[in-house]
A protein has these predicted regions:
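Pepsin/retropepsin-fold aspartyl endopeptidases
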Residues: 1-145
Length: 145
């Protein structure tokens, strides 16, 4: 099974912990997402999905109702949309059904701390399926695909 190794960026949250950021590519544009091993599902900012994803999904496995996605940031109403292609390192996810949340407050907090804007949160659905290994010492994420 091929593997891809992706560099991680460590950001300090004013001595109140840290987050790891991962670069993804959508439509040949680079974007950052937060790596969150505690998030059961990856989520993307609703403005990001409005710009890059296709119309809302009708996938029966993913029901968009209130309080569907809980992350380290919030519990919120959700929308589901599909990204034709989402690239993480050399791994390409086709027709990825994405949960969309309003991450405005997250990005405002990051901005106040001098950190870059994030497009979403990389969660357990992708991390588990692709046997994620996080090397904190070397700041690398390894995914199998």
């Amino acid at each position: 099974m091929p593997k891809t190794i992706i560099p991680l960026t460590l950001i300090n949250l004013n001595d109140d912990g840290f987050h790891l950021l991962v670069e993804i590519v959508v439509y040949r544009e680079n974007h950052l997402v937060v790596l969150d091993t505690g998030a059961s599902r990856s989520v993307f900012d609703i403005a990001f999905t409005d710009q890059f994803a296709l119309k809302p999904s009708t996938d029966d496995d993913l029901v968009a109702d209130e309080n569907f996605a809980t992350t380290l940031f919030s519990t919120s109403n959700t929308v589901i949309a599909t990204f034709p292609q989402l690239k993480i390192g050399r791994m390409v996810l086709s027709e990825y059904a994405a949960v969309a949340l309003d991450l405005t407050s997250v990005n405002e907090a990051y901005e106040q701390l001098g950190h870059p804007k994030v497009a979403g949160i990389l969660g357990g659905d992708i991390l588990f399926k692709h046997s994620a290994k996080i090397d904190y010492k070397r700041l690398k994420l390894t995914l199998s695909y």
